Amino acid sequence: MNGEADCPTDLEMAAPKGQDRWSQEDMLTLLECMKNNLPSNDSSKFKTTESHMDWEKVAFKDFSGDMCKLKWVEISNEVRKFRTLTELILDAQEHVKNPYKGKKLKKHPDFPKKPLTPYFRFFMEKRAKYAKLHPEMSNLDLTKILSKKYKELPEKKKMKYIQDFQREKQEFERNLARFREDHPDLIQNAKKSDIPEKPKTPQQLWYTHEKKVYLKVRPDATTKEVKDSLGKQWSQLSDKKRLKWIHKALEQRKEYEEIMRDYIQKHPELNISEEGITKSTLTKAERQLKDKFDGRPTKPPPNSYSLYCAELMANMKDVPSTERMVLCSQQWKLLSQKEKDAYHKKCDQKKKDYEVELLRFLESLPEEEQQRVLGEEKMLNINKKQTTSPASKKPSQEGGKGGSEKPKRPVSAMFIFSEEKRRQLQEERPELSESELTRLLARMWNDLSEKKKAKYKAREAALKAQSERKPGGEREDRGKLPESPKRAEEIWQQSVIGDYLARFKNDRVKALKAMEMTWNNMEKKEKLMWIKKAAEDQKRYERELSEMRAPPAATNSSKKMKFQGEPKKPPMNGYQKFSQELLSNGELNHLPLKERMVEIGSRWQRISQSQKEHYKKLAEEQQRQYKVHLDLWVKSLSPQDRAAYKEYISNKRKNMTKLRGPNPKSSRTTLQSKSESEEDDDEEDDDDDDEEEEEDDENGDSSEDGGDSSESSSEDESEDGDENEDDDDDEDDDEDDDEDEDNESEGSSSSSSSSGDSSDSDSN
């Protein structure tokens, strides 16, 4: 290991400190000769290599080997020696060329001596006297005493030392200016780079200002004293005062960017990225403070559950933080669906208000700041994302990832076992941490008999087989097990835990023990209700598990395509027009989807026949306008887009036929349209459009004449509703597809009720 000798050798002690015969050129020649005589694989510490050096081979001109060795010792004392001799010589060459570069400039014999500070003048004057008075004291103790004495000096006596310091300081500055004139080459070497100084942070600007103020009052204060005095003041500043320095820092940042861009144009060889120039000097907290004072609105909770928790936690300051989320979750589960929907509506309203306020805030900002805020808020796709409560979350990434999505690894038998038993163990042994709980579950799994393990392995095999069957584009999160069934005691505990925690002052362990005792002392009649609920939960679990094992139902795999400029499809009949009107005006937004469709059906039954005819005429008029607009739009398409549109319509018909079953009337229409297209190729596009409209008309007629059949009214209405919502709200296609399926199944009750009504009216 390379290392510096602990003590100098006799040769080093005897080395002369100045040899006038050696010029800079001679010293560089000496180092070059030494370099040429070094071994090729020099990896020893420098002293070892130096001891094996043949100095007679290094000798040159009139300089003998011994003279070269002495000069080398003198030079090597000026450089760091924790290296090999090869590295040392390179450093020595640099030192010979620039002996006073950087911090070594002050070692130059002509460099003026810096004046002593007022305190050091006092210290040097009194030290000898105090050392005689207290010979037993160490230098450190003497320094402490003299420092204290200096602080206790009256200002009049201190002024004597300060004036002497200022007088010598002026003289030093004059001598320094003279030194710079006499040695311009040294000053050039010591000069710092001309790259513009980086901008300071708000705290640095404040500290520099406060330091100047502090030194005016106490010019003799040390750097440590200044830091100690100002250290904690920044964090105690009011927001208003801190904003002042934030604005100054931003102004300085802007000036720096302009200067730096000019500098880069003059020095293109510098590799400085734009990111390095525009890097912010504000912390996240400072940026948020500035935005808040500029009028940026506070972001609302992402969903109804978070909103509920935020409101509940405001009144739970006395509850330990570890218990708050548990209580919130339990209280949320006890809410009725109507109460949850109210929170959902409230959350949606807060989001809408927030978006309006944020857009107003963005308008007041310059373009660069707008981009920053948009990036932070992730608002570039804000209209495509709808946050829902935990109870109504749906996978929104089914079609987005496509074939590039990495398949999810099926859960193992041990994982299935752990998920079933974890909740029970958490309640029985709440003192265990998550890691301890996992280790305990692993031991329990190992202790299970093979017969019991076989049950979980069968579930694992079923999940694995299902994962392999699933096509790549339609992967769902089916690997997750349904929520484990709860025991009767668990369901009862969830309903009463709030009361018990309040009784035992949020001591969960005591509350659980008390609940356990109460449950054990309860009569069977009292437990019966909870036992029934547990049985229902068990059935639910088995049903969901069997659904998960079953192969996925065949669905329409064709992705809904969007064509730019395509006219919006209007309602097919009076009932759909009536439904669209009620859904778009927001009158039924407070109801869940199923209840909305039921309410629409009942309202349709209650309106008069003349009103129904009015809606029917409106739908027919919109259909006529739609045909004209669609015809013009199709003719305006390029040949490639037209072909793609035709293919999409054709596939859509095929899929709808598969879902609805055979329809002789539509099949005759299709055959007829095919024969027409074969006879006249020039009118192929128009025929296709007419064919589509004929089919739409037939569907509309059948839904009106037949009384809004379950398939036509619910399916077409939901499809049209989705297309309108898609254009208005710009939602994801996956959400539209999900809603289509919901409406198809859920609209049957309303449509069937309306069918009776319309058929009655026709008969009348």
From Swiss-Prot:
Residues 746-758 have a biased composition (Low complexity). This is Nucleolar transcription factor 1. Residues 677-745 have a biased composition (Acidic residues). The modification Phosphothreonine is found at T201. It is found in: Nucleus, Nucleolus. Recognizes the ribosomal RNA gene promoter and activates transcription mediated by RNA polymerase I through cooperative interactions with the transcription factor SL1/TIF-IB complex. It binds specifically to the upstream control element. The modification N-acetylmethionine is found at M1. Residues 370-379, 457-488 have a biased composition (Basic and acidic residues). Phosphorylated and activated by PIK3CA. Its main location: nucleus. The modification Phosphoserine is found at S273, S336, S364, S389, S412, S433, S435, S484, S495, S546, S584, S638. The keyword Phosphoprotein applies. Keywords: Acetylation, Activator, DNA-binding, Nucleus, Phosphoprotein, Repeat, Transcription, Transcription regulation. One of its GO terms (biological process) is transcription initiation at RNA polymerase I promoter. Residues 1-21, 370-411, 456-488, 546-576, 648-764 are annotated as: Disordered. Residues 664-674 have a biased composition (Polar residues). Gene3D superfamilies: High mobility group box domain (1.10.30.10). GO terms for cellular component: fibrillar center; nucleolus; nucleus. Homodimer. Part of Pol I pre-initiation complex (PIC), in which Pol I core assembles with RRN3 and promoter-bound UTBF and SL1/TIF-IB complex. Interacts with TOP2A in the context of Pol I complex. Interacts with TBP. Interacts with TAF1A. Interacts with PHF6. Interacts with CEBPA (isoform 1 and isoform 4). Interacts with DDX11. Interacts with NOP53. Interacts with RASL11A. Interacts with DHX33. Binds to IRS1 and PIK3CA. Interacts with ALKBH2. Residues 112-180, 196-264, 298-362, 407-475, 482-549, 568-634 bind DNA. SUPFAM superfamilies: HMG-box. One of its GO terms (molecular function) is RNA polymerase I cis-regulatory region sequence-specific DNA binding.
